[in-house]
Amino acid sequence: MPIRIPDQLPARKTLETEGVVVMDQSRSARQDIRPLQFGLLNLMPNKQRTETQFARLIASTPLQIDLTLVRVADPLSKSTPEDYLQNFYSTWEDVRAKKFDGFVVTGAPIANMPFEDVRYWPEMLEIMDWTQTNVHHTMFICWGAQAALHHLHGVKRYRMEHKAFGVYRHKVLDTRHPFLRGFSDDLAVPVSRYNDIDRQSLSPDLDILIDSDEVGICMLDDRKYRAAYMLNHLEYDNTSLADEYHRDIEAGLDTPLPVNLFPGNDPSRMPENRWRSHAHLLFQNWINEIYQTTPYELEKVGTGEW
């Protein structure tokens, strides 16, 4: 079912060729149901690839969703032209008065930097607080998840001895949780991070949903702040990890082969996507839970009144 995105957004053609139903504004205006309002705060330099990955998953439900692409005031992007940002993205200041049913905060390639040294950290603090008054439920991804856990719960992170890089088996700890309905008992998840979070610093308001003996916690649910934290990358394409590997090799970096990615550990071969179905199922479940619990009157989002 449909997602509504800007008519000229390049991701539109990619999504349509994959069979994703993309709706234009004139068609959506004739429907009587209230579209769900979702925002995507895209912190990645390659905006087009990231927005396509998340739009693909957000579009996988029978619900009409209006997706607003959001960026911080600092463009962050050397690979995305300014006119592209002007045409398709709003700054957070542009949308801070709006209400959203769902909001996604992506990762960012700044894993080795203390949070407080990130140049847009003051704006991130405002955004994370703003989700409590203007968003019904938020999903934080990778660095975004670590940042939110640090700010909202004081969760500590630490640098691992070796980068977790590849596709790892994970255990589902609560198959009855609304976000994990239909999940198998274990799943393959793409991982690319240097840091992990300290379990001992988790607050009682946080429930671990997906975990791994090899690379640590994958996903948590936050009952207090209406949020989910996905520390890894179910949204990734087949080639996301492979592209990262080849990029680093070409740059002369000593990069290990991604674990369990290439068939026969041959980096010339196309990786197989073994996580796609769980990625779609996670977003279907998450969006359905939002649909079931969000106020019909959008202005009541974040007020606790409906």
UniProtKB/Swiss-Prot annotation:
What this protein catalyses is:
L-homoserine + succinyl-CoA = O-succinyl-L-homoserine + CoA
InterPro entries hit by this protein: Class_I_gatase-like, HST_MetA, MetA_family
SUPFAM superfamilies per record: Class I glutamine amidotransferase-like
Annotated localization: Cytoplasm
Kindly indicate whether the keyword Transferase belongs to this entry. yes
Identify the residue position(s) of the site Important for acyl-CoA specificity: 111
Q: What class of enzyme is it?
A: transferase
Q: Where is the active site?
A: 142 (acyl-thioester intermediate), 233 (proton acceptor), 235
| Record-marked site positions (Important for substrate specificity) | 192
S-adenosyl-L-methionine in keyword set: no
Q: In which pathway does it act?
A: Amino-acid biosynthesis; L-methionine biosynthesis via de novo pathway; O-succinyl-L-homoserine from L-homoserine: step 1/1
One Gene Ontology BP term is: L-methionine biosynthetic process from homoserine via O-succinyl-L-homoserine and cystathionine
| Entry keywords, A to Z | Acyltransferase, Amino-acid biosynthesis, Cytoplasm, Methionine biosynthesis, Transferase
Q: Name one GO molecular function term.
A: homoserine O-succinyltransferase activity
What does UniProt give as GO cellular component?
Answer: cytoplasm
Report the EC code(s) recorded for this entry: 2.3.1.46
The record's listing under PANTHER family reads: HOMOSERINE O-SUCCINYLTRANSFERASE (PTHR20919:SF0)
Which HAMAP family does this UniProt record tie to the protein?
MetA_acyltransf
**Family per record:** Belongs to the MetA family.
What function does the entry list?
A: Transfers a succinyl group from succinyl-CoA to L-homoserine, forming succinyl-L-homoserine.
Protein name per its UniProtKB record: Homoserine O-succinyltransferase
Organism of origin: Pelagibacterium halotolerans (strain DSM 22347 / JCM 15775 / CGMCC 1.7692 / B2)
Q: What is the lineage of its organism?
A: Bacteria, Pseudomonadati, Pseudomonadota, Alphaproteobacteria, Hyphomicrobiales
